[in-house]
From Swiss-Prot:
S-adenosyl-L-methionine binds at residues 188, 221-224, 240, 260, 277. Its main location: cytoplasm. Catalyzes the 2'-O-methylation at nucleotide C2498 in 23S rRNA. Coiled coil: none annotated. One of its GO terms (biological process) is methylation. This is Ribosomal RNA large subunit methyltransferase M. One of its GO terms (molecular function) is S-adenosylmethionine-dependent methyltransferase activity. The lineage of its organism: Bacteria, Pseudomonadati, Pseudomonadota, Gammaproteobacteria, Enterobacterales. It is an enzyme of class 2 (transferase). It comes from the Bacteria. The gene is rlmM. Its EC number is 2.1.1.186.
Length: 366
């Protein structure tokens, strides 16, 4: 198996391909990307047979922006016989993987492929049983073992492979399943909720998304992102010249500042979260977020960057690199993560967590 399959949003295959090619090159692993527009996935074929496994071990999945999932796959299985689709799939895995912890039968996130989902759910049962009999799959689900993926791109045609549970997306098809809350003021609320699921480990939610934390929402109107903070019992400074949802104001947890988000400066020093979803040039938003972090006005930030029409990956990488450099120059140690979320469209979501000042003298102030 010398290929990597990466799931992505349809229409962003070129960005996903540019990113994996760049990341592989940094590891001195070479190959070429196969891209089919609007297919919802990319294949990266390595020149050396063992390099595919090395890539999915060594490239941190959390550092990939446009990939929803990353796995090693073999050659495409075509025209699976309707009377026995199981045997060819199981045969692909003999000698490749044993005692895997989970099985996911998946499809690309396209309208055409969604018709296959019903089949995938039914097919999972006999396939799982066969894999357990062959000891390819453990009897019980084990989150510490590799995950087997069977990726159907058309009826009777699939890629078979695996990912590592410590370096993949834990979600089926790489997509968190979230429901739109009926009392939220806008659908944008799902972007921030998904960001929490993707960027913050569940065992840290009680600390980092705790009741009573103070937050600032820049460009808050009508309150989709503020809603997520209020739902977690935070106190929110909502900054926007436009009107806020009355139901949010009625909670008593929101203070509305009718100010331009680029001009607002907090008067208090107890802000933990900064969130921002403003329609503005990526460089301008990135600079604003860097200023907040350098000034010590927040501990963590989640913000959206609107994507340009061309060279999206290059533009995003440039802005994040510039931000990272600015933080380091100011003695700030931070973790930066970015993801093209399921609920994002022509944008990506970035998470920055300030750890502490790199300068010991400044740490006491953090």
């Amino acid at each position: 198996m010398n290929k990597i399959a990466l799931y992505c949003r349809p229409g962003f295959e070129k960005e996903c391909a540019a990113e994996i090619t760049d990341k592989a090159g940094q590891k001195e692993i070479y190959g070429f990307a196969r891209v089919k527009d609007n297919s919802g996935y990319v294949l990266f074929e390595c020149y050396q047979h063992e390099d595919a496994d090395r890539l999915i071990r060594e490239i941190p999945f959390r550092e990939l922006i446009f990939a929803r999932q990353m796995l090693v796959v073999g050659e495409l299985l075509r025209d699976l016989p309707p009377e026995d689709r199981v045997s060819p799939i199981v045969g692909m895995l003999h000698g490749v993987i044993e005692r895997a912890g989970d099985l996911r039968v998946e499809v690309p996130d396209t309208n055409e492929s969604k018709e296959l989902l019903k089949f995938c759910r039914k097919f999972t049962v006999p396939l799982r049983n066969a894999m357990r009999q062959e000891k390819i799959l453990q009897i019980r689900e084990n989150t510490k073992r590799p995950v087997i993926h069977v990726f159907f791109i058309a009826p009777g045609c699939c890629y078979v492979g695996y990912s590592y549970s410590h370096n993949n997306s834990p979600f089926y098809m790489g997509i968190p399943r979230l429901k739109f809350p009926s009392d939220a003021p806008s659908r944008s609320t799902l972007k921030l909720e998904e960001a929490f699921h993707v960027f913050i480990p569940y065992d840290e939610w009680e600390e980092r998304l705790a009741s009573g934390l103070y937050a600032v929402d820049l460009g808050a109107c009508p309150g989709g992102w503020t809603y997520q903070l209020v739902k977690r019992s935070m106190m929110v400074h909502a900054v926007d010249n436009g009107p806020m949802s009355q139901s949010l104001m009625d909670t008593g947890q929101v203070r509305h500042h009718k100010v331009d988000g680029f001009k607002f400066e907090p008067l208090v020093k107890n802000i933990y979260w900064l969130v921002c979803d403003m329609v503005e040039k990526p460089a301008k938003v990135t600079q604003l977020m860097a200023d907040w972090l350098v000034n010590g006005w927040c501990r963590e930030a989640i913000f959206n960057l609107k994507l340009p029409m061309k060279k999206r990956y290059e533009e995003v990488a440039h802005n994040l690199q510039k931000m990272n450099l600015q933080l380091k120059e100011n003695g700030i140690n931070a973790q930066i993560q970015a993801k093209h979320l399921y609920h994002d469209r022509e944008e990506i979501t970035v998470h920055v967590r300030r750890i502490w000042s790199a300068y010991a003298a400044s740490r006491n102030n953090d």
